[in-house]
Amino acid sequence: MLRQVTRACPFCEVRSLLGQAPRSLQPQTRLYTQVQREAQRERGSRDSNTPSRPRDRRTPETDAFPPSSDRGSRGRSPRGRDDRRPSRMILSDAVSRPPQSDQRPARRPQEPFGHLNRTRAPPSLERERERRESHFERPKRNDDGKRRTRAEPYHALKMQRSLHEVPYGNRTTIKRKMELYDSFDKMPLLDTVQAAIKDALPALEYRSPTPAQSVAVPALLGLEAKKRTKATSTKKGGPEAFLLAAETGSGKTLAYLLPTLDAIKKAEQQEKEDAEAQAQKDADEAAAKAQDKRTDIFAAEEPEVNKAVDPARPRAIILVPSAELVAQVGAVAKSLSHTVKFRAAPISAKMSATVIRNQLFNEKGVDVVISTPPLLASIAESNPNILARVTHLICDEADSLFDRSFKPSTTEILERATPSLKQLILCSATIPKYLDKYLADRFPDMNRLVTPNLHAIPRRVQLGVVDVNKDPYHGNKNLACADTIWQIGRSTGEYDPAEGKEAVPTKRILVFVNEREDTEKVAQYLMSKGIDALAFHRDTDPSRQAKTLASFTGSDTSTAIKSSPDAPPKPELASKRTLANTKVIVTTDLGSRGIDTVSVRHVILYDVPHTTIDFIHRLGRTGRMGRRGRGIVLLGPGDRADVVKEVREAMYRGEALI
């Protein structure tokens, strides 16, 4: 016979029918009316014991986080939690701060202008405002009865205010360090390294370090070593870790190359002195043995021992995420090697096995190896001793190297090189939260070298917006892109050498898209409109990639871009008009990471980037090394206009996109 069904717990009802209900669950099998009656009694007793207060009163801290009912059901997971973006797509707002320690934090003194950098009122003023509002009983509310709050900035991208985690005193300290080393002559570099700077910067009349170089070079040379605590001083044998976080186009490559080469040459001098002392010692021992041999006629002669020399043992390893960066960093290292006298070996998967073998296992040896993590990790598996003498490991574009695709091979190289490693240097223009957390756990004592303009797009870069939905485009992004390029290159199109007009330099424009398939489509459309455009993506032929980037990186600006024989044929032009002296590359994020496009003045964002990280890297291809630049966003149907608006406002104020 079935008993009365209750609404308290259906699982308990099933257990009761089977006769297996535990004692702890027996109170849950009560009638629903009985449970409801007991809940009303408890609620009444609680209300009688607590004083009455306004229902909608909230503190400033809770006001910034409204209840879940106000947010709506949009963007919630099945478990009831808010859907959050992955940490690899969110910039970290505490890059300059080391991880929290168990020690009591030191009390920070009040700076003379410290109150100007505050983004929230002091707690005393907050309590005073709450007291006044409760006294007059006139809280500011909206029509629906909720308390009215000031809209937080950067709501669309979930950002925060500029330099919220970098106090005024920290920024003053960084600027003071930059003033101390405003010239390379003030840095204690070797004479050969000082002379090599002229070869690396031939186009600059006044060679002065950038903010990233002023902060990083002295620290990497050991001039500003941090005072280690008792906990860290007990650790012995670990490498000294550095994080160089600086904006795009700030000269990070030269910032880590100069101290590394200085350390390599000093180590060579020390080894040379030790070798001379050892040779003198061996000569003395040989003379003593020769004297003993004359007296002892039965002494046996010792055979000559030939010491095996393995040339594939570099002293420094530079890891980069792409083959294009291998060629770029290798070119900078080659320009320094003529004066400093060291051997650099840039290797990538685009090279043949014979070329890689000749680069690494050269009889003359190798000092610096520039490679991608997967290639070097595969070589280290077959030749484990290749990382046995590495003292400096540099991870350029660390946010990409410690992402899901490169992290296994990067960590494998780091583990193999740790026994002999002295310095670990991580460089990046963007520090996502996942990387910041990983470094805090793996290297808690890491020295963080952060410039004041981290995660900010330079103010010398202007951002314009083209609304594709309006006339005359009517939602056609291809037409809007072609028209924008024609407006940029119109001044160069008027150049006619027959009429004796002044020559206009060739304008180079980068067009960024989100999908790899769109590169070919957009490039074909631009070519049909008389624009010299090429597609650049991962599947592009390696020889064609080198020719395409040669003119845009400044390595070969005198020659024009020529299509390789394997390139697809250009379509028939829709009209006889062609845009002269203008070169365009349509690319994905492959062309936005680390490539030094010094000759690019204009960047067009065909698609709105997914994250602020992509915004920083794409717009960072222009306005490099103190030059001016311009970025143009094509805002089409379905794009986030609020995101573009907030990025534009942040760029106008010079704030960080965090």
Swiss-Prot record:
Region (Disordered): 25-150, 268-292, 552-573
Transit peptide, residues from-to: 1-32
This protein's UniProt keywords: ATP-binding, Helicase, Hydrolase, Mitochondrion, Nucleotide-binding, RNA-binding, Transit peptide
Catalyzed chemical reaction(s): ATP + H2O = ADP + phosphate + H(+)
Group of enzyme by EC: hydrolase
CDD domains reported in the protein's UniProt record: DEADc_MRH4 (cd17965)
Enzyme Commission code: 3.6.4.13
Ranges for domain Helicase ATP-binding: 233-449
Motif segment (Q motif): 182-214
Localization terms from the record: Mitochondrion
Transmembrane segments: none
A single BP term in Gene Ontology: maturation of LSU-rRNA from tricistronic rRNA transcript (SSU-rRNA, 5.8S rRNA, LSU-rRNA)
Compositional bias (Polar residues): 25-37, 552-562
Ranges spanned by the short sequence motif DEAD box, renumbered to the chain: 396-399
UniProt record similarity statement: Belongs to the DEAD box helicase family. MRH4 subfamily.
Protein name: ATP-dependent RNA helicase MRH4, mitochondrial
Phylogenetic placement of the source organism: Eukaryota, Fungi, Dikarya, Ascomycota, Pezizomycotina
Gene name of this polypeptide: MRH4
